[in-house]
Amino acid sequence: MNIRIGTRGSVLALAQTLEVTNLLNRYFPEINIQVVKIKTSGDINNKVPINTIGGKGLFIKEIEEALLIGKVDLAVHSVKDIPAFYCDGLIIPCVLKRSSPYDVFVSSKYQSIKSLPINATVGTSSIRRKVQLNYLRPDLQVIPVRGNIDTRILKSDIGEFDGIVLAEAGLIRINKCNVIKEVLDSKIMLSAVGQGAICVQCRADDYNIINKIKVLNCHKSYVCVIAERSFLKTINGSCDTPLAALAQYVDSDTIYMSCMLSNEKEMVFSDCYFKECNAEESGIDMGKKLINELYGSC
């Protein structure tokens, strides 16, 4: 059996795809795997803030199109790149075991965000990070930065920024943890929905593929992603919506989730404990609660 895996061509995307291919090879050694690199709109338009050109869906658009027309059999994505609603006819039956969901501070000159001087410049591609940085340190000059991880680190090293904020999981996957100066606690920098998680997407009617990739699924990671994405869908969030959510198990059946929503003038937070069987419902309830707190009842 041959399986074609669609992925972006970045170093990070290929590292994530390698995790999937290694698992497939472990469980199904008879399968012949071909990795198909696909350049997405988000890769092509890499000089301007992503929220100004269509949002995070641009990182998966062409890959989903390739799936739908049968050019590839499955696709590997970062969960945080998946918009609230994706293409009809596709499903995500598998989330790999989640890596770190946290953000990190990277700088060649400073050891922490707290140690940054007044009016220091911090680079980030995320409006979620921007509003939380400005809440923590209103004096900071938060500036958009695009490009792959190495490009962003280089921009910081050569002095374009005093520091940058990145996802720890990406640095782990490409063996760049040595640049990390500070892991940011979720109490000051709550994570993006699905941050640190890799998912596998396929056609909804391709039952042979579905049955195979379900074997790779990490149940707890999948349930946490369901809870976080239910919150995202309720907000109908996109790249220009400052929101955050992190769900984590506290025991074998109980999950704790924190959420944040902002209109860039104020932020509202909510948290709760729930059983895994209530993951989707709890995400919806938290979304409705924060919408009501920020905007009032509709």
Curated annotation (Swiss-Prot):
GO terms for cellular component: cytoplasm. It is an enzyme of class 2 (transferase). Binds 1 dipyrromethane group covalently. Its cofactor is dipyrromethane. It comes from the Bacteria. Coiled coil: none annotated. The modification S-(dipyrrolylmethanemethyl)cysteine is found at residue 239. GO terms for molecular function: hydroxymethylbilane synthase activity. InterPro entries: HemC, Porphobilin_deaminase_cofac_BS, Porphobilin_deaminase_N, Porphobilinogen_deaminase_C, Porphobilinogen_deaminase_C_sf. Its EC number is 2.5.1.61. GO terms for biological process: protoporphyrinogen IX biosynthetic process. Keywords: Porphyrin biosynthesis, Transferase. The keyword Disulfide bond does not apply. The keyword Transferase applies. It catalyses: 4 porphobilinogen + H2O = hydroxymethylbilane + 4 NH4(+). Pathway: Porphyrin-containing compound metabolism; protoporphyrin-IX biosynthesis; coproporphyrinogen-III from 5-aminolevulinate: step 2/4. The porphobilinogen subunits are added to the dipyrromethane group. Monomer. NCBIfam families: hemC. Tetrapolymerization of the monopyrrole PBG into the hydroxymethylbilane pre-uroporphyrinogen in several discrete steps. Belongs to the HMBS family. This is Porphobilinogen deaminase. It comes from Ehrlichia canis (strain Jake).
